[in-house]
Curated annotation (Swiss-Prot):
Lineage: Bacteria, Bacillati, Bacillota, Bacilli, Bacillales
The species this protein was found in: Staphylococcus carnosus
PANTHER family, per the entry: PHOSPHOCARRIER PROTEIN HPR, PHOSPHOCARRIER PROTEIN NPR
Start and end residues of each HPr domain: 1-88
CDD domains: PTS-HPr_like
Name of the featured protein: Phosphocarrier protein HPr
InterPro entries (UniProt xref): HPr, HPr-like, HPr-like_sf, PTS_HPr_His_P_site, PTS_HPr_Ser_P_site
Length: 88
C-alpha cells in the first residue's frame, strides 16, 4: 500500500471539475484508491463519494492506493492535483 498526504490550496477546495478529473484518473488504475479527509475515507473512483467530503481550502487529505499499479496511481493523482492548482 502506498499513501501520500497533501494540503489543498485552491480557494474553492475540491469542487466539481477537479473532482471529476481525480475520479477519471483514479478509474484508469486497477488499484483500490481511497481519499481520506477528516477521518472519513471514500473511494476515489466515485464522484459522489469525493464530493460528499466537502474538501475545502487548507484541508489535509491523504490518498491511499493498494494494488499492482499503486505507485503509478499515486503519481498520476499527484500530477492531477498539481495541474488543477489544488496543491503546490
Amino acid at each position: 500500500m502506498e499513501q501520500q498526504s497533501y494540503t489543498i490550496i485552491d480557494e474553492t477546495g475540491i469542487h466539481a471539475r477537479p473532482a471529476t478529473m481525480l475520479v477519471q484518473t483514479a478509474s484508469k488504475f486497477d488499484s483500490d484508491i481511497q481519499l481520506e479527509y477528516n477521518g472519513k475515507k471514500v473511494n476515489l473512483k466515485s464522484i459522489m463519494g469525493v464530493m460528499s467530503l466537502g474538501v475545502g481550502k487548507d484541508a489535509e487529505i491523504t490518498i491511499y492506493a493498494d494494488g499492482s499499479d499503486e505507485a503509478d496511481a499515486i503519481q498520476a493523482i499527484t500530477d492531477v492535483l498539481s495541474k488543477e492548482g489544488l496543491t503546490e
